Amino acid sequence: MINRDDPDFWANLVDVVAQGTWQTLYMVFVALLFTVVIGIATGVLLVTTEEGGLYAKPFGSRALGKATNRVLDVVVNIGRSIPFIILMFLLIPFTRFVVGSFIGPTAAIVPLTIAGIPFFARLVEIAVREVPRGIIDAAVSLGATKRTILFKVLLAEAIPALTLGLSTTVVGLIGYSAMVGAVGGGGLGDVAYRYGYQRYSLEYMLVVVVLLVLLVQILQSVGNYVARRTSHR
């Protein structure tokens, strides 16, 4: 149990929480980087490889397009259906293979990324589907290439929805990072567990909760602001 009368109590709290905050930001935003790159590609393929889609016949083969669409859909559904706490333990051998360890902030990036990709991919799919068909048809009638339609029509028009999806994903990853911390992943979750729970320090627990709430509010507000600024409506 932590002694609140210790003259170094608050100084130690600040140091521990600062380190935990840095670890949380590190694991969340590195995981987010991989999540965004792979998630956008996956979400776009889910839309463009379906019947009548932009890449419904990759390399001239509808069978390949259909197979790609079905495989990605199944993988995304499986990824979203596994509870994160189970996914963490399931990925321990893979995490150890990739990083060399299954504990610490760097190791936590692996399960965070794998959990984030299917979640964000589905949000990307929804955002791209919301692009009016008339805009796509107009681009096709003007002779735009598939690449132009993809980047300058589909993704460009979907930016507001993608931004909201991104902020939602970040919030989800922050929540996941707290769970990772409770099993040795570091970050604010680790601080709350080791100091707030195991050592019965209400001060540590409250500071962690306040920081997590502030972090979520700030990131969500930024996402909402960017979405409003980029909306054409």
Regions found by a protein language model. Name each.
Residues 17-48, 52, 166:
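Transmembrane alpha-helix signature in integral membrane proteins
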Residues 45-52, 141, 205-233:
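C-terminal transmembrane helix and the adjacent membrane-cytosol boundary/short C-terminal tail
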Residues 1-32, 57-70:
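Periplasmic/extracellular loop-to-transmembrane helix junction in inner-membrane transport proteins
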Residues 45-90, 112, 123-126:
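Cytoplasmic-entry segments and transmembrane alpha-helices of multi-pass inner-membrane transporters
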Residues 128-158, 185-186, 198:
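Short helix-to-coil transition segments within interhelical loops
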